[in-house]
Amino acid sequence: MAKNTVSARFRKVDVDEYDENKFVDEEEAGEGQQGPDEGEVDSAIRGGNMMGALQAVLKNPPINTKNQSAKDQAEHLVLKVLISFKANEIEKAVQSLDKNSMDLLMKYIYKGFESPSDNSSAVLLQWHEKALAVAGVGSIVRVLTARKTV
């Protein structure tokens, strides 16, 4: 038989601390992320440096923030850059991106598909075709299963 004790020390252990599925709000980590620098992106577009504009717009994504206006502004800025590209420059731009930037680009492409504007769907389909050819199906799987959205 078990020994009857009056001790309550076992109740001081927080078992939820060791649960890997426990939700942890990461809002504090994303406070500094307000999205890409709009001035830098606009100056690159005006200067004709489309590769620089693409790199700048993918540089500081508002992934860890819950600020929806920052996410919408970043989405609008990315869409503006993608539309500014000529059709024959898209493949070269996609090939210049690394794996993380490619996944981020795919996130923005799918986000653009959620709310299509005038001719954005055609441009996004061109970008999706080129990105899929370079990154493969794995990029789509990573985007669709990611918990952090843009």
UniProtKB/Swiss-Prot annotation:
Query: What keywords sit in the KW lines?
Result: Actin-binding, Cell projection, Cytoplasm, Cytoskeleton, Nucleus
Tell me the GO BP annotations in alphabetical order: Arp2/3 complex-mediated actin nucleation; cell migration; regulation of actin filament polymerization
Spans annotated as Disordered: 21-45
Please state the protein's primary subcellular location: cytoplasm
Instruction: List the subcellular locations.
Output: Cytoplasm, Cytoskeleton; Cell projection; Nucleus
Q: How does it assemble?
A: Component of the Arp2/3 complex composed of actr2/arp2, actr3/arp3, arpc1 (arpc1a or arpc1b), arpc2, arpc3, arpc4 and arpc5.
What is the documented function of this protein? Component of the Arp2/3 complex, a multiprotein complex that mediates actin polymerization upon stimulation by nucleation-promoting factor (NPF). The Arp2/3 complex mediates the formation of branched actin networks in the cytoplasm, providing the force for cell motility. In addition to its role in the cytoplasmic cytoskeleton, the Arp2/3 complex also promotes actin polymerization in the nucleus, thereby regulating gene transcription and repair of damaged DNA.
Protein name in the entry: Actin-related protein 2/3 complex subunit 5-C
